[in-house]
Amino acid sequence: MRGLLIVATFLISLTAKADDWGPLQFLVGQWTGEGGGEPGQGSGSFSFTPDLQGKILVRKNVAEYPPSKEKPAYRHDDLMVIYRDSPSRQFRAIYFDSEEHTIEYSIKPVDDGVAFVSEGPRDAPRFRLTYISAGSERLKLKFEIAPPGKDFATYIEAAARRR
């Protein structure tokens, strides 16, 4: 009986940690996607996994692009750590990729999803990564870039399904 109580307590604590991600909860899991844009048509996979006892959410992403007339095949890898800022408790993220980019994001809920919006000096490009839920097993994503003083323009659009 005591063992059952320990297991039940453990499962309840896991549920509480999962709920802590609020508007990001629909992203937790493993995903496979396809899409295209400026870099060409590609495919890849990504995951959002709680880590550090549920205190952070880690996104790992891999995108592969086949060769085209303009460029050889290539692969893009990135890692993002999502956390609650202290003391504001607002969701924030820091992003690193294989092209040596580092981007700090604030995270804002949007209709049926979340938007990661870069922060930085006015004379630097801005970035916006938006995930929109398309049901429990699918989502849409859009990555946009805005040169200094300009509006956002779509760089990549993709759709993903839960694995």
Report the location of each language-model feature.
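Hydrophobic h-region of N-terminal signal peptides that target proteins for export
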Residues: A8-K17
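Positively charged n-region of N-terminal signal peptides that target proteins for export
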Residues: M1-L4
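Hydrophobic small-molecule pocket/channel-lining residues, especially in calycin-type beta-barrels
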Residues: K17-R163
